[in-house]
């Protein structure tokens, strides 16, 4: 019986998986791959949209993190993933908030003991033995401290998981064949932004600038996963499940966070290959399957 491909996505907060990789996760899950998502915090510091759940926020009941477990569970189910995995267990590390956020009583993810956090992820990698691991670039995408920390922890864990000589971590060594950063490609972003019309937006939303600092030029891209209509629909449904954090527009072509900046909901999701050997590339120089070169068939776009 042929081996089932396994992919692991590591994210900082609930909703990051749907915003960054929702179409990719749905694409591979629908084709029978084993897909898992590790989330590093409960997202306690998130800014709540609307009045219904506003009292859950950190400055009131401080119950948002627990509520977001349900949102993440629902979102993952819509993407085809059974259940969330929390690094160190649910609630081990608190959402650190943006730079300058007041420190709370429980240990923030950015203050996690490096060996403990890395060890927790090494244990997951060695248990699940993923063929592909995905996390943020060194800047954490848009720079959130927890995204940067997730990059640091994941990079160290991928290296340590395959080390035969490191016996301090549980499990048998596993060398991850391909390690990617999730990034936002400039052409896809600008095309998506340009295509938005007033019918796609709520009245209070504004379009983002064309030169947002964390988009990547096409020549730096190594891979793209293009979700079909089903994968895109799953991504939209997953984003809608994160209702305390994300509002999906009336047409399903855009969404916004609490800052009311409209973001196109893209079916194309882009990646940089930072470890492992690339598979076949298209005329743009891009892989169109994160599993390319690993001997799996039927999982490309």
UniProtKB/Swiss-Prot annotation:
The keyword Coiled coil does not apply. Keywords: Hydrolase, Metal-binding, Zinc. Zn(2+) binds at residues 13, 16, 147. It comes from Mycobacterium ulcerans (strain Agy99). HAMAP family: MshB. GO terms for molecular function: N-acetylglucosaminylinositol deacetylase activity; zinc ion binding. Binds 1 zinc ion per subunit. Catalyzes the deacetylation of 1D-myo-inositol 2-acetamido-2-deoxy-alpha-D-glucopyranoside (GlcNAc-Ins) in the mycothiol biosynthesis pathway. The keyword Acetylation does not apply. Its EC number is 3.5.1.103. This is 1D-myo-inositol 2-acetamido-2-deoxy-alpha-D-glucopyranoside deacetylase. Its cofactor is Zn(2+). The lineage of its organism: Bacteria, Bacillati, Actinomycetota, Actinomycetes, Mycobacteriales. Belongs to the MshB deacetylase family. One of its GO terms (biological process) is mycothiol biosynthetic process. It comes from the Bacteria. It catalyses: 1D-myo-inositol 2-acetamido-2-deoxy-alpha-D-glucopyranoside + H2O = 1D-myo-inositol 2-amino-2-deoxy-alpha-D-glucopyranoside + acetate. Coiled coil: none annotated.
């Amino acid at each position: 019986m042929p081996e089932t491909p396994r992919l692991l996505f590591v994210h900082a907060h609930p909703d990051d998986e749907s915003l960054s990789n929702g179409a990719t996760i749905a694409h591979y899950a629908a084709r029978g791959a084993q897909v898992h998502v590790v989330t590093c915090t409960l997202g306690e510091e998130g800014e709540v949209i609307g009045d219904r759940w506003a009292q859950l926020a950190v400055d009131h009941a401080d119950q948002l993190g627990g509520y977001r477990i349900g949102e993440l569970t629902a979102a993952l189910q819509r993407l085809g993933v059974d259940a969330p995995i929390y690094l160190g267990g649910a609630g081990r590390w608190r959402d650190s908030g943006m730079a300058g956020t007041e420190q709370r009583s429980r240990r923030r993810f950015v203050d996690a003991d490096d060996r403990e956090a890395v060890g927790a992820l090494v244990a997951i990698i060695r248990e699940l033995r993923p063929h592909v691991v995905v996390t943020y670039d060194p800047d954490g995408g848009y720079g959130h401290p927890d995204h940067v920390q997730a990059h640091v922890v994941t990079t160290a864990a991928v290296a340590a998981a395959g080390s035969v000589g490191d016996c301090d971590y549980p499990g048998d060594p596993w060398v991850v064949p391909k390690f990617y950063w999730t990034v936002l490609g400039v052409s896809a972003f600008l095309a998506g932004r340009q295509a938005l019309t007033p019918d796609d937006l709520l009245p209070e939303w504004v379009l983002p600038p064309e030169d947002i600092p964390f988009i990547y030029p096409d020549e730096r891209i190594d891979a793209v996963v293009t979700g079909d209509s089903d994968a895109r629909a799953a991504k939209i449904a997953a984003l809608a499940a994160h209702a305390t954090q994300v509002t999906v527009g009336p047409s399903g072509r855009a969404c916004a966070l609490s800052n009311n900046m409209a973001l196109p909901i893209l079916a194309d999701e882009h990646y940089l290959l930072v470890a492992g050997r690339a598979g076949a590339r298209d005329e743009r120089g891009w892989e169109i399957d994160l599993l390319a070169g690993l001997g799996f068939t039927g999982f490309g776009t």
